[in-house]
Amino acid sequence: MSGHSKWATTKHKKAAIDAKRGKLFARLIKNIEVAARLGGGDPSGNPTLYDAIQKAKKSSVPNDNITRAVKRGSGEGADAVNYETIMYEAYGPAGVAILIECLTDNRNRAVSDVRVAVTRNGGTMADGGSVQRLFQRKGVVSVSKTYEVEEGRKTETREVDEDQLMEATIDAEPEDIVDEGEVFEIISDPSAVVDVRKAVQGAGIDYDSAEVSFKPDFTQRVELEDARKLYRILDALEDLDDVQNVFSNVDIPAEVAAALDEEE
């Protein structure tokens, strides 16, 4: 850390965190705009929009920003938007499969930026379909193991376990409930994700997000050096404005994850 004060280091970290937060907000706003464009601006009749708004609120996106995004997406005002979804495919170190989902108003810019982010960091672009066939589209409802509810003037912390979720969602026929550490992921057919989400809500349980995602058929284990290389690719992709989601089949062992955390 030669030549850097503690304040300068802290300031740099805060700037990096603020930049990531800004990019997260931009992605969440895009989700809202696209959902409103495809299904209308009324969340009560557009479950995809409802869930996009819920996810944005969970990430503390201001209500005014959400309202403006709904209006833009539904064609109100001069700044109405029109994005297209494009999926790119790549391989990282150790053969890790990577799916890159873009929401863009400029296809040429998106593909150029993605290609640079992948190839300059040691990855290779893949032919269409060669990577996507290794994944399945699934509905995913994420539920935190602890959540807060308002009880009168007090805030009460509640806990939820796998048995409660299984009982709450059984009629919605989820395929699996996966323990992901601080959250449970309730996996379903994409067509059932709204039913699962409503079942969770109907049981009085809070949820973090409900969306269609890509889940790998198998995972690829990596060691420390390959994990470092992969993170460089993923970080470069996450920095791109057109990239909305990145999915991979990487399996990072706990000891490798701990070593990476120490390096940050």
From Swiss-Prot:
**A GO term, aspect molecular function:** DNA binding
Q: Does the keyword Metal-binding apply?
A: no
Compartment list: Cytoplasm
SUPFAM superfamilies named in the record: YebC-like (SSF75625)
Any one GO CC term of this protein is:
cytosol
Its keywords, alphabetically, are:
Cytoplasm, DNA-binding, Transcription, Transcription regulation
Stretches that traverse the bilayer:
none
Q: Name one GO biological process term.
A: regulation of DNA-templated transcription
InterPro entries from the entry?
A: Integrase-like_N (IPR017856), TACO1_YebC-like_2nd/3rd_dom (IPR048300), TACO1_YebC_N (IPR049083), Transcrip_reg_TACO1-like (IPR002876), Transcrip_reg_TACO1-like_dom3 (IPR026564), YebC-like (IPR029072)
User: What Pfam families would the database entry show?
Assistant: TACO1_YebC_N, Transcrip_reg
Q: In which family does this protein belong, per the annotation?
A: Belongs to the TACO1 family.
Name of the protein this chain belongs to: Probable transcriptional regulatory protein PPA1157
Annotated organism of origin: Cutibacterium acnes (strain DSM 16379 / KPA171202) (Propionibacterium acnes)
What lineage is on file?
Answer: Bacteria, Bacillati, Actinomycetota, Actinomycetes, Propionibacteriales
